[in-house]
Amino acid sequence: MTGPLPAPVSLVDIHCHLVPGVDDGARTTEDAIAWLESFRDSGIRRVVTTPHLSASHVAGSWRERIESRYLDLKEAARERVPEIELSLSFELRIDEPEADLSDPALGLGGGALLVEFPQLILPAYPDLMLSSVSDQGWRPVLAHPERYTGIGRSYECIERWREAGVVMLVNVGSLLGDHGPEAERVARRMLAAGHVDCLASDHHGRESRSTSLRMGWDRLAEAGHAGIADLLTSANPAALLKGKPCEPVQGTDLSSPLVKRLRRMVRGGSE
């Protein structure tokens, strides 16, 4: 392949860290704008930036600081990257199951709330933590389920959560091996089982964490799954933001067409 595949110009990234100076994401507004320009050039047209926020601090001064920094970024983006529709939500760390999450401004849109478990570790009572979100009227969207330590040994959790209505949002970087072999293995298992609802970049506005959503689209398309790529990076994220259900995604082998043919030959199948 000599160049990038022709992706649609309507990719939707619902998890990234571009609000400057508030978490481990972008450091400055200029940095964030530069990354938004690169997003635009790769076909992304909708971005929800999701800085970290602990459930125990949803009403504190830290959230006010985040919102102030976001407004500065929004103004700059309106002038310099008008092609991108930018909005603010949060990656809500569930550190307090009793936290009041009634403020609709916390959500991604459409009644969906992006959540994560603390410290990238599968907690002792994950179902209770997720139900504390859904019990307050939200549709939980679990950030990078493939990355939590111990999830590979407790994969049945993913199946159970999906049955309970939790949306599985996988990092593109996990499929590409950026988060280590275990996260890649679980992400590929989820993809093969049809347990991935959406992909997102989890871009952190700096070179060390700069995996883009377009990279995920390209990787799937290169493996012969452009239709699946469209669902995971465009149609399903857009539906989620509108409060509509995600389309079911069939199980997908991320191996290249050549590798698949070789496997069939080894098994004695026809090409």
Go through each PLM region and give its residues.
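An N-terminally biased module of ancient metal coordination in phosphate/nucleic-acid-related enzymes
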Residues: 1-81
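Active-site neighborhood of phospho(di)ester-bond hydrolases with catalytic His/Asp-centered motifs
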Residues: 12-14, 48-50, 87-90, 141-143, ...
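Active-site beta-loop-alpha junctions enriched in small/polar residues
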Residues: 17-19, 52-53, 89-95, 118-120, ...
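Charged helix-capping and loop-helix junction motifs
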Residues: 28-31, 65-67, 128-130, 153-159, ...
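Non-catalytic positions within long, well-ordered alpha-helices that form the structural scaffold/packing
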Residues: 40, 134, 191-192
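Extended substrate/RNA-proximal surfaces in nucleic-acid metabolism proteins
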Residues: 59-169, 252-271
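Short acidic/histidine-rich active-site segments
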Residues: 195-211
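Mid-to-C-terminal alpha-helical segments outside catalytic/metal-binding sites
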Residues: 218-271
